[in-house]
């Protein structure tokens, strides 16, 4: 593959600069290697190949899901997919940096979190990466409809050059009659799963004085406010992705993360809008206070907060009248002077590195979590797998514990001997720090003085077990109140509560919380999601009786109905011979018990057709993996008869599977 390595990174730029035609005679003839050697495909029901995609322009996106730069280009990929819907196939080649990122189920959850709609290949052993000579994340490689490499580029901000080349390639191969413009049909991961009250919650904030818990319900694009006992207070945001200011029920966000509280003011890191928002808890309004809505690629900017662009603000900490911002995009810590309404760079050169020293010379790597005791700003430096300490008054940065960009693992100990894996959350606990060691699925304790780290909770493997031997699934946010630790257990779509006295863990239940209306409406289609029609033989009912429609569904071994999701059913009848009360005809039921029994009245003799539909959300009993959603539909011909021996009940049966 020497020829691939030597040419493909520069061809694309040369072609654009010189305006060279993309014909086979004028561009280097390097056949695109096939996509093999990994653990399989997602977002498609069958394997894809370069050969089978002949006639399509193919864009390979080499990425790893913990990389902020890889996340930044997802909107560009979506724009390209929309613009060239019938000519272009984008394929994500997920070549993992971290061990945790090699797991196909973890990649599936990231696909769901970022609403990725193109096929993704799990290149867990770097087979495709090596065959294409890739050197960095993210890298995009463009392949022409004849199956030859056009070129490749690395990093962010390459939309325009890729767009222009695709336009030329499409025009040329269309003229030659060698362009396949039939849309590629895909089976997306999102079609296989349901929606829960919380979706990938990121950060969390607790306030004992006001009995409030604030949850960044990131993938529902809203903030959920509850009491500490789980009573729902309100939601901030409609659930739609957007950046609208205004009343709580009109405002919109886009995957919010970090939160900070001052009195009746809640500050919100609106991550994918690249904004800082302010929610007034008294007037119940949202206002944008920093950012332009565009992503910056600058490292040292300062000025009026609304005129300076930001880049993926991930966490917030308030010290006095200064709001510190973990700016994951440029690998820096920024600050906002709330009195002057000005933002500026606080720490970090912009170089992705583990480098201690003076504020502006230090190097960070995707800082994503912060905590403070008022004097020191502690930082979870995720991609370097370390915990940093910034002395605010002295203006210095030092590393407390951990490895480096490619030195990670799960090892307790002291100082540089400690190994973490992409930690995202921090909080002070007395004179200690608690760490959400995200990719190790653990909560750990750090003594900043001795630099000793000890694992406290979690098995090191993903799960959702409560009790004194708990398990988590990529926990990302931490909050403390009344000697209880609240954990945003992101991949479990849940908030977990650790009683720091008893050391027992429970799952936090929010009474009355449902997914945003737009999410529920999407599920209420005419036939329901993932519908299966079940044929039923004609049945008889005895006239003049009050019986029931009994629906029993067999779940796959090791699965249970999700108690947090509303199970839904609808009953429709086309005759007056059989009736069902309006209140029983269509319902959403939490904690549904099977078999389901719906009262049914056989009024008088005659034929009737009953249509019964149930939509069930079911998950593994250990709550690992994604939950599934399936709709079963029965069409039942019924004869209501005066026969005294006829039954009074209609019984329907169905079966769910653990496979798609």
Residues of each region from the PLM?
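Thiol/disulfide oxidoreductase modules built on the thioredoxin-like
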Residues: 112-116, 122-165
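Structural microenvironment flanking redox-active thiols in thiol-disulfide oxidoreductases
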Residues: 71-113, 124-128
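Gly/Pro-rich loop segments of beta-rich domains
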Residues: 182-202, 230-255, 285-312, 342-366, ...
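Thiol-/selenol-based redox modules, centered on thioredoxin-like
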Residues: 144-203, 513-522
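Short active-site neighborhood of thiol/selenol oxidoreductases, capturing the structured segment around
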Residues: 49-68, 90-91, 612
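Extracellular/lumen-exposed scaffold segments
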Residues: 230, 502-660
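N-terminal "domain-start" segment that seeds a small globular fold
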Residues: 23-50, 527-534
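Conserved redox-active cysteine motifs that mediate thiol-disulfide chemistry
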Residues: 62-79, 558-561, 626
